[in-house]
Swiss-Prot record:
Subcellular compartments: Cytoplasm
Name of the featured protein: Eukaryotic translation initiation factor 3 subunit F-2
Protein biosynthesis recorded as keyword: yes
Signal peptide per UniProt: none
GO cellular component, one term: eukaryotic 43S preinitiation complex
Keyword Cytoplasm: yes
Organism classification: Eukaryota, Metazoa, Ecdysozoa, Arthropoda, Hexapoda
GO molecular function per UniProt: metallopeptidase activity; translation initiation factor activity; translation initiation factor binding
UniProt similarity note: Belongs to the eIF-3 subunit F family.
Annotated GO biological process: formation of cytoplasmic translation initiation complex
Any single Pfam family the record assigns to this protein: MitMem_reg
Function: Component of the eukaryotic translation initiation factor 3 (eIF-3) complex, which is involved in protein synthesis of a specialized repertoire of mRNAs and, together with other initiation factors, stimulates binding of mRNA and methionyl-tRNAi to the 40S ribosome. The eIF-3 complex specifically targets and initiates translation of a subset of mRNAs involved in cell proliferation.
Superkingdom assignment: Eukaryota
UniProt xrefs under PANTHER family: EUKARYOTIC TRANSLATION INITIATION FACTOR 3 SUBUNIT F, EUKARYOTIC TRANSLATION INITIATION FACTOR 3 SUBUNIT F-RELATED
Length: 285
């Protein structure tokens, strides 16, 4: 593929990537002004999907505004990620800040080798949340200069669209619901996961009631049938395997136990990380 394809192809960004960058910025080492790392995703024929990322440790030199990346760490984490997600490839790098840094061209040279034929993308995220908004901009480097003379790089803006699947939308609705609570409750933990399951089940029940009313109205000739809706319903019904109530109950209970185990383990890990952070702060003091 041509390197210029990155300038023409549509680029879709998954919300998970933004959450990972914000979390890394919030947990950045003391004294660091920004975080940066590698963007991962998939190259399609007509578009690019940024689906994952990981941070790369770096060292900032204030005297010459230069940034050194830990290349060994980046290579090792990338190799591990390829085992877990073999379909993901390096698409470029991300950085937090308000503008493209002076060292962007040097970092660009490293990711040119990692991206192969495709031009690496540069995602700039302003994590300062100015005006309570998260600013995201995507750049692609273009060579410029006089033929036969010194050439440089110009980072041009590339259209970026945040793409969400059904699972992403469900998670973001839960986060939005919690963020709209009173200020006195903002620091409390999320509602128990089972409560969220009940809310989701109630929402599904309301949608099913609406669907049944529509079907009954069509059968009673109160509404005109729609072929598109009919084909969509048929596709949805055929996609769900036919199970009796006992098998469904067994499958649901098994998945519920797995979810509770995952919640317990994640809570233990979270508690361990919080204790580790507090101990690190005590040592710094």
């Amino acid at each position: 593929m041509s390197r210029n394809l990155s300038m023409r192809a549509k680029v879709f960004l998954k919300p998970l990537v933004l959450f990972q960058i914000i979390d890394a910025y919030d947990r950045r080492p003391k004294g660091d002004n920004q975080v940066m790392g590698t963007l991962l995703g998939r190259n399609k024929e007509d578009h690019i999907e940024i689906t994952n990322c990981f941070t790369v440790p770096h060292k900032e030199h204030s005297e010459n505004k230069r940034i050194d990346l830990d290349m060994t760490y980046a290579s090792e984490v990338l190799e591990l990620n390829m085992f877990a997600y073999p379909n993901e490839r390096v698409l470029g790098w991300f950085c937090t800040g308000k503008s493209v840094s002076r060292s962007a061209s040097l970092i660009h040279d490293y990711y040119v080798r990692e991206c192969g034929e495709r031009q690496p993308l540069h995602l700039l995220v302003d994590a300062s949340l100015k005006n309570q908004r998260l600013s995201t901009r995507l750049y692609c480097a273009v060579e410029m200069g006089v033929p036969g003379g010194t050439k440089g790089l110009m980072f041009s803006l590339v259209p970026l669209e945040i793409s969400s699947e059904n699972s992403d939308l469900l998670a973001m609705r839960c986060i939005e619901k919690q963020s709209q609570q009173q200020a006195s409750k903002q620091m409390e933990r999320f509602a128990p996961e089972l409560v969220q399951v009940v809310d989701a089940t109630r929402d599904i029940q309301q949608r099913l009631d609406l669907l049944l009313r529509y079907i009954n109205d069509v059968l009673a000739r109160k509404k005109k049938p729609d072929n598109v809706v009919g084909r969509s319903l048929q596709a949805a019904l055929t996609a769900v395997p036919l199970l009796d109530s006992e098998k469904f109950r067994l499958m649901f209970n098994t998945n519920l136990r797995d979810m509770l185990m995952a919640i317990t383990l994640s809570t233990m890990i979270k508690t361990q990380l919080e204790i580790s952070e507090k101990l690190s702060c005590m040592q710094d003091q």
